[in-house]
């Protein structure tokens, strides 16, 4: 799950200690877990299964401990994805769908977009409306409960969560 190097470098620049978890026993030393990801849904879920990390990861998240899923790491939290046949972690109810084709809009969507918070959360306040982030993605989350959306972007004329 590919952007580990980028995430590691970002956290190191903030002075954070990094522990790469290969066995969940290592998580006892962690104050938070980040599940990064670049790649495809099914191989990523198979990787978590083969490393016997799924139940421990679910328990960590359900306990309320700090967790951040980035890109594919977020997608894996959902029940399913248009990209594959393997079930996701199912922590978030809903699915991952391919971004619909929109005239004059290239998929994968690549570029800077303004992140629009929909409510206060632990990552940013609702008043922080000038957060620009870089995207490279072809899929977006469709949660069953729209109230879990913390931020969205405007992609052409439709909002993408």
Language model segments and positions:
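N-terminal beta1-alpha1 ligand-phosphate binding loop
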Residues: 1-16
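Short linear Ser/Thr-Pro motifs
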Residues: 6, 80-81, 138
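Amide-donor transfer/coupling interface in amidating biosynthetic enzymes
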Residues: 24-27, 62, 95-161
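An anion/phosphate-binding loop that grips the pyrophosphate of nucleotide cofactors and donors
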Residues: 30
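Structural motif
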Residues: 34-36
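Cysteine-nucleophile active-site neighborhood
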Residues: 39-110
């Amino acid at each position: 799950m590919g952007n580990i190097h980028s995430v590691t470098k970002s956290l190191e620049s903030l002075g954070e200690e990094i522990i790469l978890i290969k066995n969940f026993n290592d998580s006892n030393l962690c104050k938070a877990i980040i599940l990064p990801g670049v790649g495809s849904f099914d191989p990523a879920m198979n990787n978590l299964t083969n490393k016997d990390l799924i139940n421990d990861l679910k328990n960590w998240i359900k306990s309320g401990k700090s967790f951040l899923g980035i890109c594919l790491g977020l997608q894996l939290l959902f029940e399913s994805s248009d990209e594959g046949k393997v079930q996701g972690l199912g922590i978030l109810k809903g699915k991952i769908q391919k971004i619909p084709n929109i005239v004059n809009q290239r998929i994968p969507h690549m570029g800077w977009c303004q992140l629009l918070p929909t409510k206060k959360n632990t990552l940013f306040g609702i008043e922080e409306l000038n957060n620009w982030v870089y995207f490279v993605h072809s899929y977006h989350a469709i949660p069953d409960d729209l109230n879990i959306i913390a931020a969205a972007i405007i992609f052409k004329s439709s909002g993408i969560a």
